[in-house]
């Protein structure tokens, strides 16, 4: 008859291996986890904010609110880019810059964009991420367990009150990388979103914020007016009609794209307009 102690040892080993292989945690998810996942997957971010506000205050709730606030900041940026008619062409050299690589639905009637409006979009993103970071800082004081599949998160980028597969993070990732997502159960990007993940997200926000502060410290109006038609071709920019030629998706680097990129680089002798932002970066 097997030794009882060996049986218990084998049972413990089997349980440990099963947990490791399954990629799940025995820890119970926070009460905020269901509300967070439900609304992120549905793209109903305002509803998620209301649902989380109704829960008791604890570290899990604050972390969930911070995650939701960060995703909302990305949605608001995407809505602003769509409103002004951002067009991303995979073959364009000017499409390699951060923020402007974000694919948004086509807008047949974009609002005009100016240098001041562009700075306003970046300043709003900076403020929204700071608010998200403040919530995450509160959440990081305790533990959290907020399982999420990032590829299922949906955004309403064109402000039509609906979401599509192209507006999911999975769809956005596929468009940016130009690689289709795996089919079936392989198409997952699951995170436990525990305290370590919350701290990582705070670090990522700080990195993005530093880059934004550095850019906003500069006066880059001449560069914007001369080259931003590469991103916003139908938004009333000065040289759009004279310089822009249609670029078919996947057509490689068009002549106008190379010219815009060279002009952008050669005009980067920007003056510091707001020195205080450099110390904040």
Language-model features, listed with the residues they occupy:
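Short, Lys/Arg-enriched N-terminal segments with co-localized hydrophobic residues
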Residues: 1-8
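Bacterial N-terminal signal peptides
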Residues: 14-25
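Short coil/linker segments at helix-helix boundaries
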Residues: 31, 35, 39-47, 70-281
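Residue-level recognition of tetratricopeptide repeat
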Residues: 58-61
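Alpha-solenoid helical repeat scaffolds
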Residues: 63-65
């Amino acid at each position: 008859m097997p030794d009882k102690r060996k049986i218990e040892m084998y049972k413990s080993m089997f349980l440990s291996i099963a947990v490791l292989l399954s990629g799940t945690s025995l820890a119970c998810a926070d009460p905020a986890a269901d509300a967070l996942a439900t609304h992120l997957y549905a793209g109903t971010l305002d509803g998620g904010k209301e649902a989380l506000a109704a829960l008791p205050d604890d570290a899990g709730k604050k972390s969930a609110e911070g995650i939701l606030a960060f995703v909302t900041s990305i949605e608001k940026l995407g809505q602003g880019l769509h409103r002004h008619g951002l067009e991303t062409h995979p073959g364009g050299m000017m499409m390699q810059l951060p923020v402007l690589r974000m694919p948004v639905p086509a807008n047949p009637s974009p609002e005009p964009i100016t240098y001041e409006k562009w700075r306003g979009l970046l300043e709003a993103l900076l403020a929204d991420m700071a608010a998200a970071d403040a919530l995450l800082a509160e959440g990081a004081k305790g533990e959290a367990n907020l399982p999420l599949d990032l590829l299922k998160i949906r955004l309403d980028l064109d402000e039509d009150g609906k979401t599509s597969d192209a507006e999911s993070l999975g769809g956005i990732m596929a468009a940016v990388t130009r690689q289709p997502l795996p089919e079936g159960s392989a198409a997952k990007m699951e995170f436990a979103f525990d305290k370590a993940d919350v701290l990582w997200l705070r670090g990522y926000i700080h990195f993005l914020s530093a880059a934004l502060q550095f850019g906003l410290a500069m006066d880059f109006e001449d560069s914007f007016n001369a080259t931003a038609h590469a991103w916003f071709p139908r938004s009333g920019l000065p040289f759009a009609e004279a310089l822009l030629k249609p670029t078919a998706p996947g057509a490689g680097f068009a002549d106008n794209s190379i010219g815009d990129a060279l002009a952008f680089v050669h005009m980067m002798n920007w003056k510091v307009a707001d020195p205080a932002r450099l110390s904040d970066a």
